[in-house]
């Protein structure tokens, strides 16, 4: 199983790249539009890879950060959501917007994604509505900040709503930002 690829981007399309590794091998990798906007050809990058092997294909889906990869993999667990739909969500919503929509149960955000209708949006919200699942898929810093804020007596749903939109990095910075917003 391939979990990461590092190399120079030799070809770039909006949602597909070819990366040439030091070994001389080149790999085709599907990427989100957010990822595409951050990279250029002839640049060296490292990608977190989700490999999907089917009877007739072996595809790589690449991500610059672990949170986007976790979001993609989480979407794949929803009935009726395949890799193309999951990648469309990753291309349309950043990680924070996605988790905020989940925590608020906001189907309208998901319905704006090409290929997601009312039924699919509802299914995604329902199947991924478990708060614990959402928290396992955010960074360790956010999980630690959540635990700290819970001990201070704040309500879990409010904390999650604040943390998914937080811009700070690092546990202490996240806690400070959340405390300002939670009052």
Swiss-Prot record:
Principal subcellular localization: cytoplasm
Classification via SUPFAM superfamilies: DNA helicase RuvA subunit, C-terminal domain, Nucleic acid-binding proteins, RuvA domain 2-like
Region annotated Flexible linker, chain positions: 139
Region (Domain III): 139-183
Location(s) in or outside the cell: Cytoplasm
Keyword Cytoplasm included in the entry's annotation: yes
Pfam families reported in the protein's UniProt record: HHH_5, RuvA_C, RuvA_N
Keywords assigned: Cytoplasm, DNA damage, DNA recombination, DNA repair, DNA-binding
Assembly with partners or alone: Homotetramer. Forms an RuvA(8)-RuvB(12)-Holliday junction (HJ) complex. HJ DNA is sandwiched between 2 RuvA tetramers; dsDNA enters through RuvA and exits via RuvB. An RuvB hexamer assembles on each DNA strand where it exits the tetramer. Each RuvB hexamer is contacted by two RuvA subunits (via domain III) on 2 adjacent RuvB subunits; this complex drives branch migration. In the full resolvosome a probable DNA-RuvA(4)-RuvB(12)-RuvC(2) complex forms which resolves the HJ.
Family: Belongs to the RuvA family.
Designated name of the protein: Holliday junction branch migration complex subunit RuvA
UniProt source species: Campylobacter jejuni subsp. jejuni serotype O:2 (strain ATCC 700819 / NCTC 11168)
Lineage: Bacteria, Pseudomonadati, Campylobacterota, Epsilonproteobacteria, Campylobacterales
Name of the gene this protein is made from: ruvA
């Amino acid at each position: 199983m391939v979990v990461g690829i590092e190399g120079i981007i030799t070809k770039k399309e909006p949602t597909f790249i070819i990366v040439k590794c030091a070994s001389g091998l080149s790999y085709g990798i599907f990427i989100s539009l957010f990822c595409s906007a951050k990279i250029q050809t002839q640049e060296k990058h490292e990608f977190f890879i989700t490999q999907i092997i089917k009877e007739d294909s072996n595809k790589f889906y690449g991500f610059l950060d672990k949170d986007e990869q976790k979001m993609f993999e989480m979407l794949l667990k929803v009935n009726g959501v395949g890799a193309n739909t999951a990648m469309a969500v990753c291309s349309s919503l950043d990680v924070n917007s996605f988790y905020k929509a989940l925590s608020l149960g906001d189907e309208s955000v998901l319905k704006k994604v090409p290929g997601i209708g009312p039924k699919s949006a509802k299914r995604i919200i329902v199947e991924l509505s478990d708060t614990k699942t959402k928290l396992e898929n955010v960074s360790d810093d956010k999980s630690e900040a959540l635990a700290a804020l819970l001990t201070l007596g704040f309500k879990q749903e409010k904390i999650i709503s604040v943390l998914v939109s937080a811009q700070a990095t690092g546990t202490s910075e996240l806690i400070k930002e959340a405390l300002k917003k939670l009052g």
